[in-house]
Amino acid sequence: MSIFRIYVDGQLFYHPQLSQLAITEAKMTEDAENIDSLTLSAPFNHPYLDSIHPMASTIVCKKGDNTVFEGRALNDGSDFYNTHTWTCESALAYLKDSQQPPFSYKGTLKGLLEYFLSVHNKAVEEKKRFKLGNITVTDNNDYINYSNSEYSCTLDAIKSKLINTHGGYLMVRYTDSGKVLDYLAEFNVHSIQTVEYGKNLMDVKITRDHTERITALIPLGAKKKTTDEEENEVQSDERIDITSVNGGQNYIYDDAAVKEIGW
C-alpha cells in the first residue's frame, strides 16, 4: 500500500498513522497549462506549524516512494478555529526566480530550451535547478530564429518563445538525481478510470470571469512617420488609427455588449 506523506524541509509533517501529525486538508490541483498548487491545512496543535516559512521552505508530498508534489508556500493564514492554511505552488514556479537577458537565438527548438535552462540554473540555488528531459514537441524545419530585447523571467520566456508558438506542455518529473523538465506535445500518462457522477465525480463547478470583457476598444497601429525641417524621416508619438475609415471615430464597439453592461 502506498502511504501519502508530507515533508517540510525534509522533516515529516504528516503521516496518516501518526495522530500527532494530523492535518485537516491536503488538496492538490493540477493545471496542465500553468503551475500545480497544493492547499495544506493543519490544526492549531500541530507540533510543526512554525516550520513552514513561505517562499523559503520546501514542501514535498510523497505517495509510496514517488514524489507527487514539490514546491513552496506562497502564503499562510488561520481561521476562527486557529486552523492554519498554506497555499503552495509547485517546483515549476522556480522558473520564475531567474531572469533571461536579451538574446538572439538561431538553432533547434531543443537548443533554445537548453539555453533557457542553462541561464536559469546558473542563477539559482541547487534545489531550484532542472535537468532537461524528454522533448516531444517538434518544429517542421527543426530550425527556429528568436530574439528578445527585454529581460523576462525564464518561465515567461519559455511560454513566449516555445509554448505559445509551438504548443505543448511543461511537466516536472522528480527523480533521485533531481528535477527533470519535460516539454511534451501530449501527456504520456493516460487514466483508464471512468468518470461517473455521484461515484467519483461529486461536484462540478463552472466559473466565468467577466472582468476581461471589452465592450469597446481603440485600435492603434504603428507610430506615424513625419519629415523634419532637414527633410529627414522621423518617427512621431502619434499612432495610426481608424478615424479616416470609421466615420471620424477612433473606436469600435460591440453593440450587444454595450446594451448589456454599458461602456
What do these predicted regions represent?
Residues P47-G133:
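Surface-exposed cap/loop segments at beta↔alpha junctions
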Residues K110-E114, L155, K159, A216-L217, ...:
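Extracytoplasmic/secreted envelope proteins and their assembly/folding machinery
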Residues S2-Q11, I59, L181-Y183, L217:
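Short polybasic amphipathic segments
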Residues K27, S37, L117-N148:
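N-terminal export/assembly leaders
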Residues V189-W263:
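Acidic, small/polar-enriched beta strand-loop surface segments
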Residues V68, R72-L95, G133-I214, I218:
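Short beta-strand-centered interaction patches in the first periplasmic/extracellular domains
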Residues M1-S51, E89-A93, A256-W263:
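Juxtamembrane "anchor/assembly" segments of surface/extracellular structural proteins
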